[in-house]
């Protein structure tokens, strides 16, 4: 059922993409931006549904290979550009050239859920910072925002399915699925996800890649 639903929804999404690709020069800039925004939101919801169904199935279809981590991050930021621009994010990249062993599609989905979470809870003058630590046995990617953060009592549950916590007015719009799906995909990819936060001072997710 999920796959059928996604297939049906992708038809109008493909039409919207075609219009944007072929008619962008004739559209007012504000209209093009809004259509980009809607398209990316629709695609994000479809991806979440498909990954949820995929995680519950027997087949995963991952393809592990050496990946340039910066390339994956750039791809995710490009996908989320309309949402980041809508909230006026400043993105900081403090990254050395680093390769990791993973599945590109799965890794990009995981990173996208973290970015989406930061966008959802953004405050004024939002910042999204990516940094990298390279140790002897692991490479750690940190993704930090300056949003409202998470209370200490809630922090152990941020990766639980359906958990929305208490992070301001966006709580009622949250599904509690993004970080849950990120953690489940991370498990499949052999990665570790951890979260850190000070209430009122931002939220960070650390993705640990074992060195292989």
What is each of the regions a protein language model found here?
Residues 83-93:
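Short conserved segments within the C-terminal catalytic ATPase subdomain
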Residues 118-119:
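Short helix-loop "hinge" at the ATP-lid/N-box region of the Bergerat-fold HATPase_c
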Residues 125-137:
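Short beta-strand/loop element within the Bergerat-fold HATPase_c
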Residues 145:
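Acidic ATP/Mg2+-coordinating residue in the GHKL
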Residues 150-163:
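Short conserved segment of the HATPase_c
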């Amino acid at each position: 059922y999920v796959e059928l639903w996604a297939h049906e929804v992708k038809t109008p999404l493909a039409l919207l993409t075609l219009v944007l690709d072929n008619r962008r020069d004739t559209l007012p800039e504000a209209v093009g931006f809004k259509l980009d925004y809607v398209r990316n939101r629709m695609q994000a919801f479809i991806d979440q549904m498909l990954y949820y169904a995929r995680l519950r199935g027997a087949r995963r279809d991952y393809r592990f290979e050496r990946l340039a981590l910066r390339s994956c991050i750039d791809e995710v930021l490009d996908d989320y550009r309309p949402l980041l621009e809508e909230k006026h994010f400043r993105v900081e990249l403090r990254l050395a050239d680093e390769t990791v062993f993973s599945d590109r599609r799965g890794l990009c989905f995981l990173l996208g859920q973290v970015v989406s979470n930061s966008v959802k809870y953004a405050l004024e003058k939002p910042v999204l910072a990516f940094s990298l630590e390279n140790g002897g046995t692991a490479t750690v990617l940190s993704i930090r925002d300056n949003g409202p953060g998470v209370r200490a009592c809630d922090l152990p549950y941020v990766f639980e399915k359906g958990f929305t916590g208490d992070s301001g007015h966006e709580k009622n719009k949250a599904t509690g699925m993004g970080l849950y799906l990120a953690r489940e995909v991370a498990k499949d990819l052999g990665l570790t996800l951890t979260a850190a936060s000070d209430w009122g001072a931002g939220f960070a997710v650390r993705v640990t890649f074992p060195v292989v």
